[in-house]
Amino acid sequence: AQQVDNELSGIALELVGKGKDLAKDLGTEVTAVLVGSGIKGLADELAEYGADKVIVVDDPELKEYRTEPYAHALASVINEFKPEIFLVGATAIGRDLGPRVSARIHTGLTADCTQLDIGDFPINPIPGKEQLHNQLLMTRPAFGGNTIATIACPNFRPQMATVRPGVMQKAERVPGAKAEVIEFNPGFTPDNKYVEILKIVKSVSDVADIMDAKILVSGGRGVGSAENFKLLDDLAEVLGGTVSCSRAVVDAGWKPKD
């Protein structure tokens, strides 16, 4: 469950919601993993969004995100608790962390998933080949988005995936819900924390994050020109939405990358 500055990211709650759906299909429970410093209080929020258990790895060495100690912490949790499925948000942190963790625990990782289901693999029976049940079927765009691939990891556990923010739904919040909290200490050695953070400089963007927008007014190359985007700006203002655009528009210089 990704947190930044002791606040849960939206993707963390989305993954708890999807994890709850998958756990229901498998007849098991959903467990969230909290990694950081001074973050135990966030367990209650995860419980209210559907987590049955919360594993808390709380250590001063985890106050700021650093690849090595975070990868060590998650790999240790997986080796200790042996989950069937492990989901990570496809954020900047998740894309750095997920592949390193999967390599350490010797399992596969399907990146940037847009859909997760429990089903059979192979999906269509093949004569002479065993069809495995209750597999995680991970769907993601491939070849630049020109096709959709469904991938399974039948031979290794856990089945790991990074999931794009904004594509899964949060579960309905249940105020006052509680989860079993398990405190876990993976043990840190100098090899796990050899990078020292000397200074953190944060820049605050004045551009709205489209992931937080309820209404998007989006345009592509067909809008025709930078001047024509003023129509979309006006429409977004009327609707209370945010303007977004395609990569082609950015490449043409009609809209900034941000």
Sequence positions of predicted segments:
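N-terminal glycine-rich FAD/FM-binding segment characteristic of electron-transfer flavoproteins
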Residues: A1-D258
